[in-house]
Design a protein with these regions (language model features):
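Middle-to-C-terminal accessory/interaction subdomains
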Residues: 1-31, 37-39, 44-184
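Residues in Ca2+-coordinating acidic/glycine-rich loops
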Residues: 25-27, 189-192
Length: 199
């Protein structure tokens, strides 16, 4: 409390990390499969979040932790039992200044790489690139129409999976829009404005 976390963390990396984990609603976020790192002091003495990895149980593809639902903050879902979210994630999340910067960053990304058109374009591009390997994959591993842990839905075709991914992501973004449309005010460096570059 005396020093504050802004001098200890690269805030931009934590904001982007949380935004991506919340967009995907990745059940392994914050509690498992989480990387943070620090360079040597001569380069930067702050802690960075990332890289993101292991999102196979994200985007509505998991039947526990309420991650199939498009609403709700994953960071706020912390039931009793194993695999608890570490307390410091909650402290960061509940900080007014962090929330303001988080909301601003989301608004910036929503008009670019978080736009529905951009995301659907990436999905379509990857699907096209994979081409015939999709059929070969399911020929080798006949998973379509069969339950595989911990999938929430069982799809009969790859096209159904792609449609679900796009629909789920779009609905998730609608919910995030509703939550982040009003920015929380905060002034990190007491200069009368709040901006990511001030961090």
């Amino acid at each position: 409390p005396e020093i504050g976390y802004f001098s200890l963390l690269n805030i931009e990396s934590f904001i982007d990390y949380i935004l991506l984990q919340e967009l995907s609603k990745n059940v392994d976020a914050y509690r498992l499969s989480t990387y943070i790192y620090k360079d040597k002091e001569s380069i930067d003495n702050r802690i960075y979040a990332g890289p993101i990895w292991d999102i196979n149980h994200g985007y509505g593809n998991c039947n526990y932790g309420e991650t199939w639902l498009t609403e709700g903050w994953l960071l706020e879902y912390n039931p009793e039992g194993g695999d608890q979210i570490s307390f410091w994630w909650e402290l960061l999340w509940n900080d007014t200044n962090f929330q303001t910067l988080f909301s601003e960053r989301y608004q910036d990304l929503r008009s670019t790489i978080f736009s529905d058109n951009y995301i659907n374009g990436i999905v379509d591009s990857i699907t096209t690139h994979l081409g015939p390997s999709i059929d070969r994959n399911f020929s080798r591993w006949p998973l379509l129409g069969n339950y595989t842990w911990p999938n929430y839905y069982v799809f009969d075709s790859y096209e159904e999976e792609i449609s679900y991914l796009k629909s789920w992501t779009s609905e998730r973004l609608r919910w995030m829009d509703s939550e982040l449309s009003t920015q929380i005010t905060g002034d990190i460096n007491l200069d009368g404005s709040v901006n990511v570059v001030d961090v």
